Swiss-Prot record:
The keyword DNA-binding applies. GO terms for molecular function: DNA-binding transcription factor activity, RNA polymerase II-specific; RNA polymerase II transcription regulatory region sequence-specific DNA binding. Keywords: Developmental protein, DNA-binding, Homeobox, Nucleus. It comes from Danio rerio (Zebrafish). Belongs to the Msh homeobox family. GO terms for cellular component: nucleus. PROSITE patterns: HOMEOBOX_1, HOMEOBOX_2. The gene is msxd. This is Homeobox protein MSH-D.
Amino acid sequence: MEQRKTQVSSHPFSVESLISSHKTNKDFERRREDVSSQFAQTEIRDSCGSAGIPKHFMLQTSPVKSESPEPDDCTSWVMNSRYSQTRQESPCPLRKHKTNRKPRTPFTTSQLLALERKFRQKQYLSIAERAEFSSSLTLTETQVKIWFQNRRAKAKRLQEAELEKLKLTAKPALHPNFSLPLPLGTQLHSAVSLYGQSYPYQRPLLPVAPVGLYGTPLGYSMYHLA
């Protein structure tokens, strides 16, 4: 009877055998999942460092610098170059005057007219004249002295410019080797008008043969010449 029970229980199509086989399948799948999860954890542990960071990330953050610049360095370089270009392209600063330079004296219209009038009369003032003139204009002697110095320099520049203009307008239009023929009987005033200089005019003399060389009397020769 016991053998029959064992035979019945061991039958492959029995309920107990089916339940036991189902349990074994579940256990096998659970064990396989555990093994696969353990294997994945070991792979991750092998691929990561001590701090749990992947090795490829650790290689990028290694102290050895690669040939290509890092993103942060590239960004900082671009920003620095952009701002440096804007600083270079900024307009050049104005010329700085000396700190100890005195400000320019603002003259009034009446003072300028009086200074110009005095300069036309006399370009150089003596010490007494300068003191008197500056007191009449309520200016200092230094201001009057500096104004006269600047005005003399301006007058010199204007004079040089006028001389250059006269030189340009006075250039001869004809070639320097070209000369106009003058007739023999040209009067003195024509020579003076052309050259601006006066020279004593002399009529050219014709060669005359001596009288003693001819055998005929003087009166006869003069008669025939007439």
